[in-house]
């Protein structure tokens, strides 16, 4: 305990540094006598501070509290309205402010002009192009940096260099911001016209990005990269990130492979000491030179020089610097364009008649055949999911926007909302619900648009289609994805794989007679030429499928799906441009359909197959693998002779020529040693990931609270760190302090302590030690966890009112009646709860809940309520186990080579000792027999929590549960009476525990938990047959050992002599574990 609390205390003295400021620590203890002293201590502090007396003597008098109790929070108040930022900033604003080049970007509004030059009046102003969309302010960010600088001003040696570098960069930011004054944010953390009119429009988002970059500077190289990006991104708001990251697609082709990992038959990574030389034709170097020249033209100096220096010997040892540049380029922030430009981008492509019709035909046929292949089993067997597709669609309907705001009546309450789920309920109540009619999206009813912003790319538009489109596509797409799940070609969907498996797949076939072709097809996916052949291929496939069945319901499902494709072939979109709404005929494919991901993958696979079939007319090769991953596709081709420069050049030109014949504007490259796609890149036989998650700017605003965003910030920091981009941890912790503090009044604020923010309760935000998820087992930890659990989820009056209305009740019972054959309270209640949870995305409800949550939290942070909760958490289980473990020192040799060079040392060390894993551990119960049985007869998908609850019921009840979901009685009886059922109990418990312990998140997802090297450090004498207990003991031991190794860089072995008498007690407890959702778990989930 301590680092966070220490920094917190220092931070508060830094912020409130005037005479009138007071900090009062609040302590608690699970020991009732000490707890009494804590309460006395607190009231005396309050008394003294009211009288303006010093608190020093109280601290002495209550030494026992300060030493033995746990810090709960710090209450801080100050009568100074703190414009302290401005005052402090002047001290750092000693440099020359940046001047924006006002002609740096093609689009006028992307130039960093004064706001009043871009938007002459308040009415025209919008912050949508520069909104940081995060619930923390520029002034907080400036404070956090200045706090760090003040704290480290006297550092020595290497640390002093870091201080100097950051100070230098901050001087640029401070001088520029100070020139115009710090923009003040409003209550919603937005920057209004009055504040911004005399300041550069992009000042805030630029300053946020710059702060994020300068707080990630450690080495001299970091400093050079950051300086260049900070200075240039002030002017260039459009192409900088793209320019800096472009060379990577070529750099990966330049590094020889000298030893790599490949996927073996068991789908594990296995070291191979093969040597593959990088064969690079001159043309490639010319293209690279052109990229570097473009960088120089844009004013970059140091970055292109670093790349040129690396090119001298192209070594993998120095490649991490290239990876670093690639990652850093994304931290200049999001490129946010006007919707009109984003839409026109796809419509600008000139359509030519001069295309290869033969290739288009082949492309369409391949799409058609793939659609048929994916669905024919389901259609021939009249799959129940295709029969009840409407119900399945309704059950998984999201609460996203339906594209228009409507007035809805729920009982006596009238509300305005755009949410799909509410529209469906309302339509059903008013007889307007007609899933059999897919509304047109033509000129009479154009599609409203959403947006997707991403660093280094143009803004993309998203269709917000009426909910009928989702219902029509849901079931069919689910079937397509199920097929993709066991098809290796679909890297993104392939069963439980992770990116390491795809990495081993590529390196597996690289040799001196093979080349790999990799293409980024994101331009093609959203190009107009794609739309006709794409939709037609799908339609033709659906027509063939419709002739394979006589089931009217299945035919109807396919017919509706086909209708969505026909409608979308004639689509118009509505784009607000100033005050007018423009209607534009939009020919391209945009995301927003349920089928987007699946259909794009099918089309990309068809595209690369079409291209390869043309290339095969000219060359003789074997296609070893073809893979599609999102917007990228790649294939490894094996020739019967050794690859030469000339061959690489010829194949490369032919491939590009082939794409050109389809008028596909794509970036196609050929290499012998590496690839670069959006998700990952392989160079020198090693795998790299782009560490490009922005911390202080967000893509869009949602309805998450500050706490949620603090957890997301931390989670993003962890992901970046695993991928090789490290931001100063103290800075991150300072941001967490700022974002989790709660204002009580204008001058009174409460700051939660480390214990509150790191205990796994509903309020957890971060881990006290990076990469280690701790489950507190001390009395104080369990005590505070119980206290937080008593703060059960908050009620919302609006939600209750809606849920009590006839409209809502009828909807829920309609779903239940369609789904269930007989009464089943578990499922009915589950559906009602799910539907009620969907209401949370309606702002007034989430606001109401948040207020309740905050006030409960305020009470709790001032005095924890003792509450004897009968709920059992994973902490209780570990608390029971812990005493029986004995630790001794051990030794594990490093025996595996590095293959992910960007990992932090402590994580790398563990992988090198125990090995890595290429699969996700199943943590949703979907592999259990009961789950398979349910999905065989019903469209209902129980969650792991529900399965865990059901499987522990009496056999009679399980049987009733199954029968009510439409499972034939004979199957239900067989299941309950079989061995499979007892295996399931174990299997589901296992999944549930894995789920609770976040085993597929953070760095745990990289470790091989079944490593024999790890097993041999654990000794647990075998007693009695309770596999569940054996499992939890082993898993606990593994986590303890791994956590110890992450922290200390050395190994321990564990011996456990667990008494047989305790085992049955523990086993019973294990069936009552409550799962805890927190901002922290949501952030993990959000990473997914």
From Swiss-Prot:
EC number assigned by the record: 2.7.7.48
GO annotation terms (biological process): DNA-templated transcription; viral genome replication
GO MF annotation list: nucleotide binding; RNA binding; RNA-directed RNA polymerase activity
Reactions listed under catalytic activity: RNA(n) + a ribonucleoside 5'-triphosphate = RNA(n+1) + diphosphate
Residue ranges of every copy of the RdRp catalytic domain listed in the record: 501-687
Main location: virion
Top-level division of the source organism's lineage: Viruses
Complex formation: Interacts with VP3 (Potential). Interacts with VP2; this interaction activates VP1. Interacts with NSP5; this interaction is probably necessary for the formation of functional virus factories. Interacts with NSP2; this interaction is weak.
Name this protein carries in UniProt: RNA-directed RNA polymerase
Organism: Rotavirus A (isolate RVA/Monkey/United States/TUCH/2003/G3P[24]) (RV-A)
